[in-house]
């Protein structure tokens, strides 16, 4: 079984990826936050740095690309190939309203005729040795089109089909649709990867029991809260407080080298702590102070309070759903 770190916009960029790979070397593949295909087929700034092989030497990175113009996608693929990549992942899963309104992300699932034509042209024109995987949801407002959608995927040689069994309208709310995923599982001929609400080892094992032929599991928010989750799934030790603290220090240092200005850095670290804090569920005052911190000094004081006053309880999930 393969285990993947999901692409999470703004947070799973190379500073966090490298820190995670350094402390928890159990991930088979990391996926970059999505990059929008463009007419130039070239990227600068933080996207260029995030995709740079020099910034991803200790891990296997699969760039995720979003777009609906075949020519733009091909230019992005060429850019990636020049960097040494041999595969990209197509984003057909982003539920953001602004993205969907443009017919991108999960919005591409609306028109299967367009999608078929898009895939035909993409596979016809791309370099033969460049692999394409796809990450998608199971529909827009309902899952009634699962048979048509995944039969369509079967017509093309995707290296993997990664499925988050929610519809776009759910965003990340409610439960995943395991009945819907069962239908996908029965239809799909390409290698299939499960993604969605894996927050502990027990849930991962149940998914593998229910769907024994899947080729992998992709983890996102659960892995941000418990960076040792895949190690636990593989039968290793559960997360220890010291390694979490050391990991957080490494994340702080890595982002401080990428982000200019304490204000911007503080925003990023608060975002990270929305997940780290799940391991300190009773440290209510310290967590509130950290959220309100306006300077790095206040941030460090709040973090110290969380550590000194709050009991470390390794995160095991917020709900039982399977």
Map each language-model feature to its residues:
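Flavin-dependent oxidoreductase catalytic cores
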Residues: 1-322
